[in-house]
Amino acid sequence: PALGVGPGNVPCYIEKSANLERACTDLMLSKTFDNGMICASEQAVIVDECLADDFERIMKENNCYFLNKEETKKVSDYVINPQKQAVNSAVVGKPASWIAEQAGVKVPDKTKILIALLPDVGPEYPLSREKLSPVLAYFKVKDWHQGFEYAQKMLNLGGLGHSAVIHSTNNDLITLYGETMKVGRVISNSPSSQGAIGDIYNTNTPSLTLGCGSYGHNSTTSNVSSVNLINKKRIAKRRVNMQWFKVPPKIYFENDSIQYLQKMEGIERAFIVTDPTMVKLGNVDKVLYYLR
């Protein structure tokens, strides 16, 4: 397997308890960074229905453009190569307004992100794939069960082992999301691009090479760094069988403790562990005296 990397079809789930203003800010900060070229950038936002209206309002107020069905089809046909079922390399890292123009869609020049509402995830919805540009799929879900389902569908379509994002104040749900998603890194309440590459929003190792583990046919799920490039040599010495001896249940160690030997009942045999110096100093004779 390769050390890293793999495709990142990153889902971003905004759960009903999330700080919505911050979640939207994080999403825009991440998706507009390098015009969405980072493979860890969000490829779809999955929003609980109860937040959808406020989500759309906030995004529109910040120059994000929601495509209608006709516009979605035009952008989809241009952004995703139908033969390869992969992103058109011409759009990678390009501004949203440029992409819209090439697709035949008129949007304001200051548009930051093109957002397409989709009914489901799958090959029949090309914009649910990795896009590496400021084009974002958008799904509305009833609850966290459906939110998790859509997030995993995104990963299964082409992002296994990479990254997944969740915005929530429910720590138990965040933990469950982390346990459920088949990814190497789960970004919680942070922008995915900056969060996945590490150091800025968390303690992940800073790296632009993100391992996807066995899910993505990589050898590691970590952020690849110099540590992964160091050859470690191990000398394996022969190990003998364990040596042991039995000690008594009580050990007396204070001064003059050998006097207790006189009071111990049932002693028929004694084994004295000593050395020549202790013999010369007379310490062994003291022990023998009390044993007799």
What are the residue ranges of the model-derived segments?
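Conserved C-terminal structural/oligomerization subdomain of aldehyde/semialdehyde dehydrogenase
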Residues: V105-N241
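Short glycine-enriched loop/turn motifs at secondary-structure junctions
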Residues: V5-P7, M37-S41, R129-P134, G158-G161, ...
